[in-house]
Swiss-Prot record:
Leader sequence residues: 1-22
Main function: Involved in assimilation of trans-aconitic acid. Preference for cis-aconitic acid is 14-fold higher than for trans-aconitic acid. Not active on intermediates of tricarboxylic acid (TCA) cycle including citric acid, succinic acid, fumaric acid, and 2-oxoglutaric acid or on other dicarboxilic acids including itaconic acid, formic acid, citraconic acid or maleic acid.
Mechanisms controlling activity: Activated more than 1.5 fold by Ca(2+), Mg(2+), Mn(2+), Ni(2+), Fe(2+), DDT and 1,10-phenanthroline. Strongly inhibited by Ag(+) and Hg(+). Inhibited by addition of 20% (v/v) glycerol. No effect by addition of NADH or NADPH.
Temperature notes for this entry: Optimum temperature is 37 degrees Celsius.
Naturally occurring in which organism (per UniProt): Pseudomonas sp
One GO term (biological process): cellular response to nickel ion
GO MF annotation list: aconitate delta-isomerase activity; molybdate ion binding
pH relationship of activity: Optimum pH is 6.0.
PANTHER family in the cross-refs: BLR4797 PROTEIN, MOLYBDATE-BINDING PERIPLASMIC PROTEIN
EC top class named in words: isomerase
Subunit structure: Monomer.
UniProt protein name: Aconitate isomerase
Organism lineage string: Bacteria, Pseudomonadati, Pseudomonadota, Gammaproteobacteria, Pseudomonadales
Cross-referenced InterPro entries: ModA/WtpA
């Protein structure tokens, strides 16, 4: 099992006292992270850097979509990267294309869809499917993401719920920006996104998870980019993120940790 960070930190500090290690250049890993798991990597980064001497250059990048910032589009342009943290189903496509190393893949956390309103606004009832449907139909405006949760809502859940004809006219997909930010500015009354993504946005109140009958779990995973210049360091970071030592950071970010992998 990957050692705990305090142990790593002690070893790193001892090794750092030797002239040989002091002469070594600092390894920097470029980490492309989807918003749903960004809270996790941000939380562990300071201690991980201190313990290992490896610097993490973390960039926000959606798991999918047409924006230039999306991870698949960045890799298609051959932008340098070492590790990707993203929606598992989108990662599967990168594995299939050979852009990430299949044997490096780790599953990290399960995410669920939540609803938010502007801070201080009334919190509508979404405790069951009937109440949820009424809340959607009464809403003045609805926003959802252009990532996995939004695709599911717009293509599967909303049509399945047989909402009134006026609903889709007031619902819109938000590209390249957190849905919570749109809600915080008052540009949408209701916002839907992964709980882990909404938790990071100021100016909103999270009403709660949508009902179980409407819910869809999204798996967040990580892998090493095939063209990584630092494969050993990249694999070590992924091994740590998949260990029980990172479970608290995963949970803090709003995800349900996947059991540590052997």
């Amino acid at each position: 099992m990957f050692p705990r960070l305090p142990t790593l930190a002690l070893g790193a500090l001892l090794l750092a006292s030797t002239p040989l290690l002091a002469a070594q250049p600092v390894t920097t890993l470029t980490v492309l992270s989807s918003g749903g798991i960004m809270g996790t990597i941000r939380e562990v980064a300071p201690a991980y850097e201190k313990a290992t001497g490896v610097k993490l250059d973390i960039a926000a990048a959606p798991s999918m979509g047409d924006t230039p910032q999306a991870i698949p589009n960045r890799l298609a342009r051959n932008e340098p990267a070492d590790v990707v943290l993203m929606v598992g189903s989108a990662l599967d496509k990168l594995v299939a294309s050979g852009q990430v190393a299949k044997d490096s893949r780790v599953d990290l956390g399960q995410s669920f869809i939540a609803m938010a309103v502007r801070q201080g606004a009334p919190k509508p009832d979404i405790s069951n499917m009937d109440a949820f449907k009424q809340t959607l139909e009464k809403a003045q405006s609805v926003a959802y993401s252009d990532s996995a949760s939004g695709v599911y809502l717009s293509r599967i859940l909303f049509p399945r719920m047989q909402l009134d004809k006026s609903f889709m006219a007031k619902a819109r997909m938000i590209p390249a920006e957190p849905v919570g930010a749109v809600v915080a500015r008052g540009e949408a009354q209701l916002g839907f996104q992964q709980l882990s993504e909404l938790k990071a946005v100021p100016g909103i109140d999270i009403v709660g998870l949508i009902p179980d009958q409407a819910q869809k779990m999204t798996l967040y995973s990580g892998a090493m980019v095939s063209k990584s210049q630092h494969p050993e360091a990249a694999r070590a970071l992924l091994q740590y993120l998949a260990s029980k030592d990172a479970a608290k950071a995963i949970e803090d970010s709003g995800l349900k940790p996947v059991p540590a992998q052997p």
